[in-house]
Amino acid sequence: MKKIFIFLSQSLALGVCVCGTIVNVANASKVLDVSFVTYANEAKIEFLGVKADTILSNGVVSEEVAYEMAQGVANVAKSEVGVGVTGVAGPGGGTAKKPVGMVCFGFYVNGKTVTYTCRFGEIGRNQVRKSSVEFVMAKLLELLDD
């Protein structure tokens, strides 16, 4: 079995959630090496290499930004796997185009980046976070299995 490391970049109040889910298992350091929590746009730009134009053109909650976050964290960590997550957990902050419960995901796996958007709805901040963690874990397993 090939050993892989997972690298995460998150801006949706998930920093503790995704990492917490992984580190709750013994020997988590065998798969998790680094995680960035980049709430500020400047942090996404400085640490992950997200382009300011991408944020300006698409908004921070977008598949385009999640894409660049996933690629950025993988690049910084020199990894084959990177995950980027950005969204609106609520209770406020949503708009008609980007409502509360909308979360965008980027997955960089072995040189290929794919993105997804989930609209969990106004199910409460903690449930949006929980649903996002579940999505990340399930999708990672699926993509790594391919």
Predicted features along the sequence, with ranges:
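Short alpha-helical segments enriched in small residues
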Residues: 1-146
